[in-house]
Each structure stands twice: as structure tokens, then as C-alpha cells.
Amino acid sequence: MLYTDQDDPVLIDRTGRRTLAVTDPRTHCIWLAKGLHGRSLERVLLHELGHATLVSYGMLPELHRMVRPAYWTEAEEWICNLLADYGAMIFWKASDQLGYDILEWQPPYARDGIA
């Protein structure tokens, strides 16, 4: 993860829009705008980690198989927004139902890290 100024061209995404963060699959780097903090930083980071996970674990071809090419970017953004907006709640509710913190356990693939 690298922080950069909000007006840095690196924060222009593949659609040509200026964003608060960008994941670059070629360099395996997440770029975040300086000044993000609190819940905004959490949401943006979770969203970008969603992109990194899709790329690192080779999930994009599967997504592309299920979605028409015109909607590939929109579908990827939807998945990353789902993770950012509801991911923590899902784990909290599962932990509550099971009676223990499920985040204490790490699946083997999570130990390898996200490229």
C-alpha cells in the first residue's frame, strides 16, 4: 500500500475517473489518497483489498465467465462494494451466532497474503 496526493494521476481509474484509491494489478500495489481516515479509510481499503483478492487469486476469469463483457467493470465494482459495505457485518453476525470470533482462524490461503 502506498499513499499519494489526491491530485496524483495514479488515482485516475481505468474508466478515466479520479478516485480515492486504485489497485494496480500490474504492480500489485494499492494506491490510497492521503487524508483518508476513520470509516472512510476502512471502506476504501476493504474495497481495494477486494480488487486485490480478485486479481491475486485468479477470480476475474470466473467473474468474466458469468457476466457479459459490457458489465465486467460494473460487476467487479459491485463485488468490492459488497465486501466494503457488508463484509464486517457478515463476519460479526457469524461470530455472534457461533459464539466465537471467526476471524481468529485463518484459512490456509489467507496466510499466503494478497499480492
Question: Model segments located where?
Answer:
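Metalloprotease/metallohydrolase-associated module, dominated by Zn2+-dependent proteases
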Residues: 1-39, 58-115
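Active-site recognition of the HExxH zinc-binding catalytic motif
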Residues: 43-55
